[in-house]
């Protein structure tokens, strides 16, 4: 809808920005022309991976689609730790919205600059936050969270993978949701072992075992 503004901040921890864009081009070619063109083919890698002139023309046609995609989806592939992702999104919040005090009065520009600089006491007057656009939906998509760089604990030791993911979800994602109204979406992969068909004692396939479950994450 025209009165809704959507931004998706896609923290791609597994694929580079280039690969995500090439994947979208591949999807475009299949959706519109039913052509299966892999990322490897788009990169013209391999002895026989040459693209015919017709497909090259169709790839150029995808430019408008890709630009529209990138207008909404901001691909970030160089920010990888929980605190770094939080700081990145906090800076986004500073640029697209405003803080108010308990009386509903917008904080001054100078007060906002003090908040951005994280000066002592700068955040004491903050009561709530609003995006400048009244219906601005901001999705923070992290794919996938088991690839997060391990965070340092308050004692200075490195957290485990589980502790890092827990800190990201329970501390930073909740803060982004509650303070700024952002929408965190965390992707977690199913282990490959759970994708194998399992059978019951009679040898019959147990299809329910293929459904995602906590023990397979």
PLM-predicted stretches and their roles:
Residues 171-217:
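Phosphate-binding/switch region of NTP-binding enzymes
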Residues 74, 152-165, 196-202:
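Flexible beta-alpha connector loops of hexameric P-loop NTPases
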Residues 147:
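Residues immediately C-terminal
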